[in-house]
Amino acid sequence: MKTIAMTIIGAGSFGTALAIALARNGHSVLLWGYNPQHIKKLQEQRCNQVYLPDIRFPENLLLEASLETAITASDNILIAVPSHVFHQVLYNIQPYLDQHSRVIWATKGLEHGTGRFLQEVAREILGEKIPLAVFSGPTFAKELAIGWPTAMTIAASDAEFGKELQQLFHCDKSFRVYKSSDMIGVQLGGAVKNVIAIGAGISDGMGFGANARIALITRGLAEISRLGSAMGAELSTFMGMTGLGDLVLTCTDNQSRNRRFGILLGKGIDIKEAEKQIGQVVEGYLNTKEVYTLAKRIGVEMPIVEQIYQILYCGKNITEAANTLLSRTLKDEI
């Protein structure tokens, strides 16, 4: 019988934070990272000084450098890696899964290069039998790891699996977990909000005020909802944690890499230098192209996403992009 409640793949900031939160709940957790030297350092220091300095690991948080050992240690495998490596990680873990394995991901985004939902990628690689779930919501890794009050949502392909995960992560003192059956809506909210957050950051970097920021957030939510409706998501999902909640958090708090990236662009710093200053993956930059392409393919109007795409991938002047949005044909709000 497997004694590890969950194996977490990805020893970055969010994977580490989830491991700490789950271990704090009294569960045995195994954390795997691709760099053996990094894992060795985590084991020696019993904290992740690179991403979450001075937050100590609970004793029941274990470290592992062998992928095979990590995957075979638990039935529950949670993936917390950037979206552009999600496909490769699934491909790498697939040989070690068995008939009891269940896969969850906290990755936010669409597949790099194809624009596919991560659920589609998982089904293609893992087959139809393995239960799947996505874990998302308005959460910064540091606050979760510290133990400050946080809420997230789990959407699962199987209702009983979703309920088990909800109970596994939920903590009355600090971590409230909601359950959903809308995997499409939960995935979409987590992907598109990062793109809108870049726009909110650009607006603030240009010196526009709170009025402009909230207009971007509100109209950004409308764009997410339109795309979600066209993809078969439940509109109510976008008024919850993984829609409105995650969008507002990412657009307004400077812990957000996507927002900070946008601020730098708004101040006139070029893309490569902005990425360098952020120092970690900016998911919104990678996903802007995928979201824009998806919207065009299915005929959904997303003017904010389109202008951010024009800035990031076509070299459009930021002031010109802002003017394009402001000068659009007048219309009813809803």
From Swiss-Prot:
GO MF, one annotated term: NAD binding
Database matches in Gene3D superfamilies: N-(1-d-carboxylethyl)-l-norvaline Dehydrogenase, domain 2 (1.10.1040.10), NAD(P)-binding Rossmann-like Domain (3.40.50.720)
Record-level GO BP terms: carbohydrate metabolic process; glycerol-3-phosphate biosynthetic process; glycerol-3-phosphate catabolic process; glycerophospholipid biosynthetic process
Lipid biosynthesis found in the keyword field: yes
Keyword Oxidoreductase recorded: yes
Residues the record lists as binding NADPH: S13, F14, K108, A141, R257, V281, E283
Pathway field: Membrane lipid metabolism; glycerophospholipid metabolism
Annotated Gene Ontology cellular component terms: cytosol
Protein's name according to its UniProt entry: Glycerol-3-phosphate dehydrogenase [NAD(P)+]
Organism: Bartonella tribocorum (strain CIP 105476 / IBS 506)
